[in-house]
């Protein structure tokens, strides 16, 4: 059994015992998203958020699913809500910056990536994201600086 199937089986066992277990719904949603089952991921994130409308992790997880589906408006709305609940959530801040980058709002993307770096300077993927924006707008020296810093952190961050 691969690790996703094993994780899915575990979450299903928990949810069979308690279908209102928010962390298990969000966890299963992450597995669904990782395996490309976006509709199932959204259904589980939606249910988790129905049960706990203040769960910033579930809201940011749904936002990330929307981002991967190129549902930019929905992703931004969810990232905004997650950040409102947890203003120091570097993952949500960086995710929102990725959406801004995707829709060409580079100033907001740079501000978001910088804020995420300030919140957690150990996330190589955020440095690499800001580096990509710098590259896109022709600020090559700053891009190289961020890429170099990201490479230095890469061993500890598989998403870089």
Which residues make up each language-model segment?
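Conserved structural position within tetratricopeptide repeats
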Residues: 13-16, 47-50, 81-84, 115-118, ...
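Register position in tetratricopeptide repeats
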Residues: 34-35, 68, 102-103, 129, ...
């Amino acid at each position: 059994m691969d690790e996703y199937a094993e994780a899915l089986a575990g979450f299903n066992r928990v949810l069979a015992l308690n279908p209102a277990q928010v962390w298990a719904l969000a966890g299963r949603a992450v597995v669904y998203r990782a395996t490309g089952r976006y509709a199932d991921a959204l259904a589980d994130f939606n249910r988790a958020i129905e049960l706990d409308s203040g769960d910033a992790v579930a809201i940011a997880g749904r936002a990330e699913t929307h981002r991967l589906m190129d549902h930019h408006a929905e992703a931004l709305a969810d990232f905004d809500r997650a950040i409102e609940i947890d203003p120091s959530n570097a993952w949500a801040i960086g995710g929102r910056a990725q959406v801004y980058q995707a829709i060409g709002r580079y100033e907001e993307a740079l501000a978001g990536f910088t804020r995420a770096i300030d919140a957690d300077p150990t996330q190589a993927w955020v440095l690499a994201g800001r580096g990509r924006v710098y590259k896109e707008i022709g600020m090559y020296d700053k891009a190289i600086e961020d890429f170099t810093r990201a490479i230095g952190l890469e061993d500890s961050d598989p998403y870089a």
